[in-house]
């Protein structure tokens, strides 16, 4: 559990799921300004973390990944009674209107298209956290 040194509040736990190692660490640096960040390289690794007791406040996931993609992860979470309430932000290069609709229907609360600005991602994560409260 991480504590904000300025406010004394507990920082939210953010799970970032991304197969591109460079982008994964860049996203971690961005989101570390607002929360405690845990990383997974694909949907299977994320699901393993979640099923072994890790409880994030929000998940940020890429859509296209090996082993288990973000869409399958979102659908799996949505169908799981214990994990279905976790807010999910999709972060992906697939930015067409139908891609966004598919992501939202799969369980994502927000959709961020790559390339993206740090402020846009942080804004969507904050909105997902607020909606969860």
Which ranges hold each PLM region?
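Conserved acidic carboxylate
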Residues: 18
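Two-component/phosphorelay signaling modules centered on CheY-like receiver
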Residues: 21-39
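Acidic, metal-coordinating helix/loop segments flanking the phosphotransfer/catalytic sites
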Residues: 39-58
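Receiver (REC) domain active-site loop signature in two-component systems and cognate sites
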Residues: 65
